[in-house]
Structures are given as C-alpha cells and as structure tokens.
Amino acid sequence: MNKKFKCIGIVGHPRHPEALATHEMLYHWLKSKGYSVIIDRQVAKDIGLKDAQTGGLTEIGKQADLAVVVGGDGNMLGAARVLSRYDIKVIGINRGNLGFLTDLDPDNALQQLSEVLDGEYRNEHRFLLEAQVRRNGQKPRISTAINEVVLHPGKVAHMIEFEVYIDERFAFSQRSDGLIIATPTGSTAYSLSAGGPILTPNLDAIVLVPMFPHTLSSRPLVISSESSIRLKFSQNSNDYEVSCDSQIVLPIQDGEDVIISRSKQKLNLIHPQDYNYFNTLSTKLSWSKKMF
C-alpha cells in the first residue's frame, strides 16, 4: 500500500472561471475530509479565501506531501520545475487543452482523487534536464526543463550553425533552424511535432531532434540520459537562445557554449491506479485505435 497524505497543496494559475471553480471546489472538499491544505496565495485571493493557509510553490514544496496542479500542461511544467526540488508527489487535474500530464478529468476528479488519497495510485519518477550557458571562468546561467531544451535563433527565424559534442566527443555539425533536446516526458510534445520518436517514460534516454535541417541525411538521435551534450557555435551567435519548456529563455553570447545534462532533480508524478500510458497516447494524441 502506498503512503497516504496529510497535507495537500493546491497549485494553479487559472485564466478561466471554470478553473477557479475547480480550485474552490477542491479546497472545500479537502477541508471537509479533514486534510491540512495549503493553497497558492494568488488563487486564494482570486476565489476570496480569507482564512486559508497560503504560500508560493516553494512553501508548498516544503510543507505539503502532495501537490494537486489544476490547469493544463503548461501549468504542470511551470510547477514541476520548482516542486521537483522537494520530497513531494504531484498529480494534475486537467483544465487546459491537451492535458497530457494532468490525468484527472475535472468532471470526475473528486472520485479519482479520493482513491489516490486512500493510497491507490501509481508512482512514476520523471527526470529533468539541466541547461547551462557558460563561458570559461564565469558563473554559468542555469535552468531546468521537464519536457525539452530547445536551441533556436532569437527574434527572427533563420538558419543557424552549431556543433554537437556528446560526452565531450564530436558527434555532428548542423545547419538548421535549431535543435530540440527532449526527455521521455517531452518526447510527446514539441519533439514529436518535429518528427522525433516517442520514448516511454521509464526509459533513461534523451532524444536530439533537428529542426528543419538543411540536409537530406539528418535524423533524430537517441542517447543515454547519463550522457552530457555540449553545443558549440561560431563567433556569430549573439542572437541564439536556449529555451526550457518554452517558459524560460537563456540568451547565448559570443564565446559561450551550452551544456545539457540530466538534472539531479526528479519529478515524483503519480497517477490513478488504472493509468495506462498507451491509452493516454490513444486518447490525447489520437494514436492507433484498438482493432479487436
């Protein structure tokens, strides 16, 4: 039997009344069940909770043992990068569009969540990537990503030139619009749209997917998650950037390299007991339907 939970964190950045209603319903339901609840302070303000215990993601990560993220995949990615620093499990209620990482249907969320709170859930550890933009002798600029780190030009789309080193050995050079470096979690996101393979979440692997390469022979490359990737550039790299989960942007200056490796952090994602990854591919991405 999985451990049960005592303190529940409620997280989200709602844009729609339906999402706010879900936050409010969830808060009062958890309190009626006798749980200690800490809710995102901005959400508490938006729904008019005056006596609730509130905090930011850091406080929720430190105090709660389960965080319920209400929203879409973007909300989950933003919260997960912070919550992965702490010993806290995370589950999502989908109030977005695709909801690939947010398992719980808002119309049936309380029933599913009740089973989870009773200890009936599946554990899954998702690793993150760490991106460092660095120059010798200087402090690097660092961010993490759940889905992917993307190398791309800045404000104007154009072809860029770079070299890729894996474990400090030259692997390939490329002229393209950029490069997507994705985790198994991110293999069903931007990487998939660019022609990358689907990696099941239990794989310790990273996929490198070229973006519109100026060659007929370029193909996605899958490597061990234990490998490090170094991107080197010509002297004209002032308008290059790397973005993490399309939410954090690190500009690249002349003379700087980018190093991407597996982060020490991991996301403790949990799912309902009946969760099936391949069913998620089918329902969310309209993947192959069962024939018989």
Swiss-Prot record:
UniProt keyword NADP, yes or no: yes
Highest taxon in the source lineage: Bacteria
Chain residues that bind NAD(+): 73-74, 147-148, 158, 175, 177, 188-193, 247
Keyword check for Disulfide bond: no
GO terms, biological process: NAD metabolic process; NADP biosynthetic process
One GO term describing the cellular component: cytoplasm
SUPFAM superfamilies found in the cross-reference section: NAD kinase/diacylglycerol kinase-like
Transmembrane segments: none
Active site: 73
Co-factor(s): a divalent metal cation
Subcellular location: Cytoplasm
Keyword tags: ATP-binding, Cytoplasm, Kinase, NAD, NADP, Nucleotide-binding, Transferase
Known EC number: 2.7.1.23
GO MF assignments: ATP binding; metal ion binding; NAD binding; NAD+ kinase activity
Catalytic reaction equation(s): NAD(+) + ATP = ADP + NADP(+) + H(+)
Family: Belongs to the NAD kinase family.
UniProt function note: Involved in the regulation of the intracellular balance of NAD and NADP, and is a key enzyme in the biosynthesis of NADP. Catalyzes specifically the phosphorylation on 2'-hydroxyl of the adenosine moiety of NAD to yield NADP.
Protein name stated in the entry: NAD kinase
Organism: Photorhabdus laumondii subsp. laumondii (strain DSM 15139 / CIP 105565 / TT01)
